[in-house]
Amino acid sequence: MAERKPIISFRNFSFQYRAQKRPTLTDINLEIYPGERVLIAGPSGSGKSTLAGCINGLNPFSNPGACTGTLTVDGVDAPHSSLFELSAHVGTVLQDPDGQFIGLTVGEDIAFALENSCTPQDEMYAITRHAAELVGIENHLGYAPHELSGGQKQRVSLAGVMVDQVKILLFDEPLANLDPATGKQAIELIDEIQKKTDTTVLIIEHRLEDVLWRNVDRIVLVNGGTILADLRPDELLSGSLLAENGIREPLYVTALRYAGVDITPDKHPAHVDSLVLDDTDTQKLRDWFTARPRPAAQPEREPLLEVKGLSFGYQKGQQTLRDVGFSIGKGEMVSIVGRNGAGKSTLSKLICGFETPDAGEIFLNGKPLAEENIRRRAQHIGYVMQNPNQMISKTMIYDEVALGLQRSGLTEEQIREKVEATLRVCGLYPFRNWPISALSFGQKKRVTIASVLVLDPELILLDEPTAGQDFRHYTDIMEFLRGLNARGVTVVMITHDMHLMLEYTRRALVFCDGRLIADRTAAAVLCDPALVEQAALKETSLYTLANRCGIAPAQEFVERFIEQDREVREGGC
């Protein structure tokens, strides 16, 4: 039998960026074999993106640096090759699909690489059509990129790299900008493509539970520029390495730990549906549920933000929001959820005054906001956009965060104290004198959050506040927001992160096709399968676990878990 040869091989490999004093990767030894599905996980700054950049050639050809050791990619000596040559072996799907579009239509974008290689037109059309069919986008070849949803854009990006018939597909945080249902479909698509083509698949992602919706062969855990673990999912989830290195384990695994269940590889904890629980394990969960008190009822609150009969459309005859009405109380922490294109971001623009409603009114502290201009609204409502590049206007991190305080009447010393305190909370203090251009997408996101939080607004409205964040920075940001909320600041978050919704907000507003279809507790939303499907959300694995163990009502199981999780985060039992 012939010896199996790796398609990717790192041997004693180190990489140091030209602008850095120390190597970002140190003594990497890793082999990945043809047809494998490998998840590369690690906290922000761990080196996982640098590792991926060495595989696809971005390092050192676009990001100059020095390599030692060897790296072979599909038989090619990667550090001594070229970006062009490596692109014939490795196809990369970026975190932000908008950054990968080149053509004016879907068809043109998919065919771009074929045009560069002077492929005959008839052959080009056939290959483009086949790639589009493979990813299920064949009916959109004439569409412009802006006419596509986030999930459709990602499919186009995938088709664009598959026309080269690459042997390796690398996905850089493929779930970061997708709603839960579309993210689930993305993982299913990656799994389907891998099975059809036997392509080697590498996924860089923070959202471990979502990636494990479909099987992966191994999880490579990276931190501090080294590989800490290279294990099967069942093995890694049985230990404590994930939590120790800032990676969130699946919620059902945490629930089992709270109940005192011993998690071992033979219980197959990689997916809630494959989980093997004996009678003793099930009884431990039931006993834990019985022993936990019901969460206290939430008090009635004086309204802060009131929306009444709100309707809006960007074009005549097309309504993005239809007759939306709700009230948010002072000191509440609320999630706004729903599929991409449901109207969530449009609602935030109307609240901030960036757009004017066609009908309806918005009130803050009982006063109509229509009488306030954008500048005056901003004194009360802080808004953090989803895309940090659309907010940043300064070159340096410190200057960006301090910008809003320049006309506040504070002294330079007072400004410095406020800015540095906020930077510490957001995990940016070590980078305070860095240029923003040197930051990752996730780090830029933290800069924009810091620039709003430093102003102490009455209400903070955040569009995807934790997108691209590892669990440690996610927790730092959310605990900071929770601390503000505990002091009476109202926090409203537009999010695709169902964990965030459950863990930090007791109430969720659910949107679908421009309408508010539910206003319920977060647990109630994710324990309603019909609502979950309608709004393109994702059932929590806690709901599945409760049903498997015969614990009813499942919603109370979820609520009691979340309550204990809050206690643990706050240093309780």
Regions found by a protein language model. Name each.
Residues 41-43, 337-339:
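The feature captures the beta-strand-to-loop junction immediately N-terminal to the Walker
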Residues 56, 352:
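Helix-to-loop junction immediately C-terminal to a conserved catalytic motif
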Residues 169-172, 460-463:
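Catalytic Walker B motif of ABC-type/P-loop ATPase nucleotide-binding domains
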Residues 226-252, 515-542:
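Conserved beta-strand-loop-alpha-helix hinge in the C-terminal portion
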